[in-house]
Amino acid sequence: MAVPKRRVSKTRAAKRRTHYKVSLPIPVKDKDGSWKLPHRINTKTGEY
């Protein structure tokens, strides 16, 4: 079983965690000019 050789400092652990981020969906402009999320139905026109 693998065991850490030495303790990881708070700073080093925080630097590693900077890459753990949530990617937000990018809104797309629809044909009628309103913004919507991709792969969602437009509530005004009913189009996908």
Swiss-Prot record:
Name this polypeptide is given = Large ribosomal subunit protein bL32
Q: Where is the composition biased (Basic residues)?
A: 1-20
Q: Where is this region: Disordered?
A: 1-48
Residue spans making up a coiled coil are none
NCBIfam families associated with the record: rpmF_bact (TIGR01031)
Q: Which biological processes are named by the entry's GO terms? A: translation
GO MF: structural constituent of ribosome
Pfam families in alphabetical order? Ribosomal_L32p
| Keywords noted in UniProt | Ribonucleoprotein, Ribosomal protein
A Gene Ontology cellular-component term: large ribosomal subunit
* InterPro entries per record: Ribosomal_bL32, Ribosomal_bL32_bact, Ribosomal_zn-bd
